[in-house]
Amino acid sequence: MGNSSASKDIKLGYNTGYWGSGPPHGALEGIKEADRLGFDSVWTAEAYGSDALTPLAWWGAQTQNVRLGTGIIQMSARTPSATAMAAMTIDHLSNGRFILGLGASGPQVVEGWYGQPYPKPLARTREYVEVVRSILKRDKPIDHHGDFYDIPLRGGSGLGKPLKSTVHPLRKDIPIFLGAEGPKNVALAGEICDGWLPLFFSPKEDAFYRKCLNEGFAKSGEANKSDRFE
């Protein structure tokens, strides 16, 4: 997102999307060719059929350099702990090439497929990312009691205690990208994440979205965050 005009800032990604009735024909060949040609990243997606992680691990194992991203993992499909586990695992297996793309999805999928409520997506996203980052840092056992996630669960058997991942992350700062469309969600991406996965983006709206991102950068407390934000 930096203001540099050099062509080196242009990165190419290859998105396989989510599956239709089965695996997309030629996806593996396309991914291997993208890797050979020097593409920056390849991406998988999920809705209510194929998941994003399994194809990424399977196809990604046959690449060498390209970054491997989820565009997106639906937060309602997994607890923050499960997402952090998957991120650490794939990052190890890919030798530090994983990008964790997250998104809230929408009520039609969250309620209709996962059978979960769709409350306050902005606040829930903020808390979700906070928990994932805490797990990845592995500084201490997770003891988080927020509005949406209660770890360890209070009021249960009493046997649940704060835990710390047995796996040491290859990178404690695995990049987290946020799939976002609305202005508040885009600003949230700029504030708490490392990149933004836009939906229905048009270049003619660039100034509008830059304003949203800049609002988020200002709230992040990180100087010059726009220089590294993707």
What is the role of each PLM region?
Residues 1-230:
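Active-site-adjacent structural elements that line small-molecule/cofactor binding pockets in enzymes
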